[in-house]
């Protein structure tokens, strides 16, 4: 895990045990307190999964250059051939879709497979948008039964409070207004022309 803010990570360890469920004590976990982009630029490691969970790109904020075509290119180059990246991409309220559409459009400049999805995030009180991007793996081609089998092979399905085969299919089946926002957006976010959310 790469996070620029060591203090926030420590506070999460202390105060959010129900969220991390001991993941920080897992011997496979390494926490690096540094800039994620800088880390990807210098590492030669390859990853099966990269999860990008950022604050939105606010003016003068640290995340502005972590939503760009160039950053997504770094992620692509650090994924294994079957690797995937997933990220949060803002709320999916009907009149708040420019950011979601621009992230999708930018990812399509870099990855051959981009699968937008959404889920309800109770602490935000609204549906929230996410993206999955890869060099070839497409989660929309998996049946509910296949997803349930994959989950059961890796962990106890009863420990998951949300995801199963049905939720998987539902999340990737976007309502018409959301599909249109993704298809019609032509904004490509770059280092030279970052998107700022106000």
Predicted regions and their residues:
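The AdoMet/dcAdoMet-binding core of the Class I SAM-like
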Residues: 1-84, 94-100
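A near-ubiquitous, low-amplitude feature marking generic local secondary-structure context
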Residues: 19, 23-26, 58, 86, ...
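Short, surface-exposed linear patches
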Residues: 21-25, 53-55, 72-75, 107-110, ...
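C-terminal substrate-binding/active-site "lid" region of AdoMet-derived donor-dependent transferases
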Residues: 42, 61-142
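Soluble small-group transferase modules, centered on the S-adenosyl donor enzyme superfamily
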Residues: 116-198
């Amino acid at each position: 895990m790469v996070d620029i803010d060591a203090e926030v990570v420590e506070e999460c360890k202390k105060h959010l045990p129900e969220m991390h469920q001991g993941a920080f004590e897992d011997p496979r976990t390494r926490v690096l307190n540094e800039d994620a982009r800088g880390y990807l630029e210098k590492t030669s490691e390859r990853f099966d999964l990269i999860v990008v969970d950022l604050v939105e790109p606010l003016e003068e904020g640290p995340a502005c250059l972590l939503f760009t075509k160039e950053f997504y290119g770094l992620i692509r180059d650090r994924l294994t051939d079957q690797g995937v990246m997933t990220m949060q991409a803002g709320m999916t309220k009907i009149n708040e879709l420019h950011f979601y559409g621009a992230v999708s459009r930018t990812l399509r400049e870099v990855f051959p497979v981009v699968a937008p999805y959404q889920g309800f995030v109770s602490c935000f009180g609204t549906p929230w948008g996410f993206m999955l991007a890869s060099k070839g793996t497409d989660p929309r081609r998996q049946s509910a039964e296949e997803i349930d089998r994959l989950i059961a092979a890796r962990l106890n399905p009863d420990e998951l409070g949300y995801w199963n085969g049905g939720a998987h299919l539902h999340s990737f089946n976007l309502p018409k207004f959301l599909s249109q926002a993704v298809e019609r957006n032509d904004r490509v976010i770059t280092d030279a022309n970052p998107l700022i959310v106000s």
